[in-house]
Amino acid sequence: MRIQPPSDLAVAPVARAADDNRATLGGPYSLASSVAKLAKEAVAAQVIAFFDEKSSSPETRVRHPTRVQSKERLFPPGAVVRRVHGDVTTMMVGGISGLLLQMLHPAVLAGVWDHSSFRTDLQGRLRRTARFIAVTTYGSKLEAEAAIARVRRIHEKVRGELADGVPYAASDPSLLAWVHATETTSFLNAWVRYAEPRMSAADQDRYFAEMAYIAGALGADPVTRSRREARDVIEAMRPRLVCDARARQVGRLVLYGPPPNWIAAPVQALGMHAAMDLLPDWARRMHGFSNPRLARPIIRAGTLGVARSLRWALQ
């Protein structure tokens, strides 16, 4: 599935399956097919609802200054970004893993802790992040630029001091570079592990090169244009990283927060384990996560199964 921009999001009516059932219920095979179709549409509706503007409160919806449609896109068909960002499972796993990495930076954590509704509206925060990615990846250039401008305005207001009195600002180019490098690396790692294990090194570097536009537009410096450059940014920041009580609390909120519904509970739990497994060893140790080598094949096989099932449901 590609997570389409807000103006294109639509859930196919599940009621349509009922009409199909009445026309096709004629034997065990047609019954099984009808049940499968109902299940498929139900799963699709649940997943798409998470990204649907109608499913969020008026206060937390992503607002776009313009709805003017244009064929011009930041990333045209064939872009690697469109491929990598087009899978729900890998984006969820990569997004959570990236978030766990980002929170190890005291200034990033402080910005989220002091200025965000993260602790009280985790689902809303994740939804808004997902929609920003959807708009910038698949929306028109006008929609993408409007979303970027909105985020920049928000960043300008996020300022404060750390416990030791050191000032921080969300618009700090080095912090933006850290967030971008960890996010893109995590998205790509999840894609390679669960969708395209034979992805070429050239395509992986092309992903970073394409995403460099977003980093630069948001104000990041340095702007990473290859996997190696992203790795260098992450390695250079490691001496400043800390996992304190607040980082652990945010980690618990992310990993063990309530699922949107009971159906999603087992899938969410598996996804959280996959996100922890995706972390580099040093980050896993900082968080105090165990390294379940015996469980790792089960986690990866289960996540791969979920990914394939969701692709089937959303194709």
Where are these predicted regions, by residue range?
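Mature, function-bearing regions of proteins
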Residues: 2-178, 182-315
